[in-house]
């Protein structure tokens, strides 16, 4: 089915509707799973030596010093234009503003007289950021990960990226307070961060996108007792646009293509109650495709994408909630009125002047988002991902005495005698003191 095929949702059977919202299949092949497992074990056993061997094998690069020197970072900074540096500074300021506002106030309540309960927040002590290499370095992801890590107060923030690391990535790391940068890419970088080597420190949690090998490596280390936690499950990028008859077709098309150009497994969907809007968007997509350097990639993504005509905007919202897109763009009159009806989306963009690109780079929200349907249970990345919450309770003698019989009754009902005894012994001690 080509992207210019306009689909009438209400003419489809329930099974056809289900198929329309199916995402392109993703699963690690057995060979990838085995290869990644071998890489993890090898890096854990042989450390830096294994990292250098993998760099030669996969990156075709001889790495002498795994850690990037301060001189190299300074030289990278010199090579960048002032215009780009200023743009990064604006983006970081907005990201800082939004993520600082996410700080939770401490919770300190007396649940009943003499029973004090608190919730306090602490940073994750050490985090590792993975940034892919390639022809289009994702330096914006450095800003999105390192900025909240700094605000959270993480004591150690390190970054791995395949050599040679782009100047933009090195400068962004310095700008956002990353302490150490390492010339390591792929599954071997995830292994190094999870287990530690002579050069790369072991971290508590790993963040960042990557290819199938990186994704599988993150999955595997997150399930190993000696591994590390990860940010969230990863999947292909996606966008869903809800547009009414008043939307601008060129704007809608550009937003759809901005996701389609990410990769051939990306998925884009247009929902509109106006059949004429669907037709005009399809035409605009074709016009804009002709001008894109990554047109072939975008065209492959469009093969799994959809133009769907609905009964009304309420049905658009219903379908969107069922799909749960990574990015949801609402280009309708009074777009904000629909927000309260949205239940599942990674990030929402309202109105003609809120392109998804704004959130990707500089509005201040985070561009690391749940995808592949994980919006049903996962949140967009934020300050909380770099923190952990801890509860504290303190009972006075009076508070304990008032609550003791309740605890004893509940513990006895669960047949946990030692739990009950821990209370009964204290009750008896208080009686002896009286």
Swiss-Prot record:
Highest rank taxon of the organism: Bacteria
Listed name of the protein: Histidinol dehydrogenase
Family assignment from sequence similarity: Belongs to the histidinol dehydrogenase family.
Cofactor note (record): Binds 1 zinc ion per subunit.
Cross-referenced InterPro entries: Ald_DH/histidinol_DH, Histidinol_DH_CS, Histidinol_DH_monofunct, Hstdl_DH
Main function: Catalyzes the sequential NAD-dependent oxidations of L-histidinol to L-histidinaldehyde and then to L-histidine.
Positions bound to substrate: 237, 259, 262, 327, 360, 414, 419
Pfam families hit by this protein: Histidinol_dh (PF00815)
Positions annotated to bind NAD(+): 130, 188, 211
E.C. designation(s): 1.1.1.23
PROSITE patterns tied to this protein: HISOL_DEHYDROGENASE (PS00611)
Taxonomic path: Bacteria, Pseudomonadati, Pseudomonadota, Gammaproteobacteria, Enterobacterales
Entry keywords, A to Z: Amino-acid biosynthesis, Histidine biosynthesis, Metal-binding, NAD, Oxidoreductase, Zinc
Residues where Zn(2+) binds: 259, 262, 360, 419
Gene name of the record: hisD
Source organism: Escherichia coli (strain K12)
């Amino acid at each position: 089915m080509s992207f210019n095929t306009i689909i009438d949702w209400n003419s489809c059977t329930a099974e056809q509707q289900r198929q329309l919202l199916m995402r392109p299949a993703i699963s690690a092949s057995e060979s990838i799973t085995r290869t990644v497992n071998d890489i993890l074990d090898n890096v854990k056993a042989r450390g830096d030596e294994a990292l250098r061997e993998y760099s030669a094998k996969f990156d075709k690069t001889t790495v002498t010093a795994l850690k990037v020197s301060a001189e190299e970072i300074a030289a990278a900074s010199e090579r960048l234009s002032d215009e780009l540096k200023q743009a990064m500074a604006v983006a970081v300021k907005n990201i800082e503003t939004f993520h600082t506002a996410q700080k939770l106030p401490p919770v300190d309540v007396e649940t009943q007289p003499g029973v004090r309960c608190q919730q306090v927040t602490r940073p994750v002590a050490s985090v590792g950021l993975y940034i892919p290499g390639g022809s289009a370095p994702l330096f914006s992801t450095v800003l999105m990960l390192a900025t909240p890590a700094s605000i959270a107060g993480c004591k150690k923030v390190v970054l791995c990226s395949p050599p040679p690391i782009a100047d933009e990535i090195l400068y962004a790391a310095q700008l956002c307070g990353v302490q150490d940068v390492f010339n390591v890419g792929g599954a071997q970088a995830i292994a190094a961060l999870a287990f530690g080597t002579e050069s790369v420190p072991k971290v508590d949690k790993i963040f960042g996108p990557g290819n199938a090998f990186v994704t599988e490596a993150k999955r595997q280390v997150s399930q190993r007792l000696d591994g590390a936690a990860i940010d969230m499950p990863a999947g292909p990028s996606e966008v869903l646009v809800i547009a009414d008859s008043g939307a601008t077709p060129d704007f809608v098309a550009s937003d759809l293509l901005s996701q389609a150009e990410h990769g051939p497994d990306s998925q884009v969907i247009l929902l509109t109650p106006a059949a004429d809007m669907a037709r005009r968007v399809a035409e605009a997509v074709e016009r804009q495709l002709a001008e894109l350097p990554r047109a072939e990639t975008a065209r492959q993504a469009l093969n799994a994408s959809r133009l769907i005509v609905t009964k009304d905007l309420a049905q658009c919202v219903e379908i969107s909630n069922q799909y749960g897109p990574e990015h949801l763009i609402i280009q309708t009159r009074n777009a904000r009125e629909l927000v309260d009806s949205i239940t599942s989306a990674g990030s929402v963009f309202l109105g003609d002047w809120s392109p998804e690109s704004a959130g990707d780079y500089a509005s201040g929200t985070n561009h690391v988002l749940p995808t592949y349907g994980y919006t049903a249970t996962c949140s967009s990345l934020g300050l909380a991902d770099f923190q952990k919450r801890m509860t504290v309770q303190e009972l006075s003698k009076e508070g304990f005495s008032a609550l003791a019989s309740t605890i004893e009754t509940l513990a006895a009902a669960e047949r946990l005698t030692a739990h009950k005894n821990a209370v009964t012994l204290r009750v008896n001690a208080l009686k002896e003191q009286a």
